[in-house]
């Protein structure tokens, strides 16, 4: 019995000029997601997924490598301008923005969208080391 060839649909690369880079910088990891203006994800990368494990995930260099990996993928979409949204207090905040700038993107706007509670949940107790 002859097998019928499996047909895969050819993926159409959409051209996106303006995008939004969402940077989530926690104390343990940094997540970089680049979306179009509507919020559809084009690419994402993390410090942990870039080969850093344990305490090395939470370094500025790991965040920089994650941003460079994400920028490589997004270059194929023809992205030129980026608006940056930074969330969280982590060590990868500035280095991620610098890496995106060095990758050749024109950064139009940097916004801090860190959620600040209006006296909401009780914070975790202080560490005793």
Curated annotation (Swiss-Prot):
Part of the 30S ribosomal subunit. Interacts with proteins S7 and S18. Binds to IF-3. It comes from Histophilus somni (strain 129Pt). Belongs to the universal ribosomal protein uS11 family. This is Small ribosomal subunit protein uS11. GO terms for molecular function: rRNA binding; structural constituent of ribosome. Keywords: Ribonucleoprotein, Ribosomal protein, RNA-binding, rRNA-binding. Located on the platform of the 30S subunit, it bridges several disparate RNA helices of the 16S rRNA. Forms part of the Shine-Dalgarno cleft in the 70S ribosome. One of its GO terms (cellular component) is ribonucleoprotein complex.
């Amino acid at each position: 019995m002859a097998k019928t060839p499996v047909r895969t649909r050819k993926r159409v690369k959409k051209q996106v000029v303006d995008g939004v880079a969402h940077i989530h910088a926690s104390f343990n990891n940094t997540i970089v997601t680049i979306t179009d203006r509507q919020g559809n994800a084009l690419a994402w990368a993390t410090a942990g997924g870039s080969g850093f494990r344990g305490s090395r995930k939470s370094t500025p260099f790991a965040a920089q490598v994650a941003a460079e990996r994400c920028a490589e993928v997004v270059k194929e979409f023809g992205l030129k301008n980026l608006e940056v949204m930074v969330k969280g207090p982590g060590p990868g905040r500035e280095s991620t923005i610098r890496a995106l700038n060095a990758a050749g993107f024109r950064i139009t706007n940097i916004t801090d969208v860190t959620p600040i509670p209006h006296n909401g949940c009780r914070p975790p107790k202080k560490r005793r080391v």
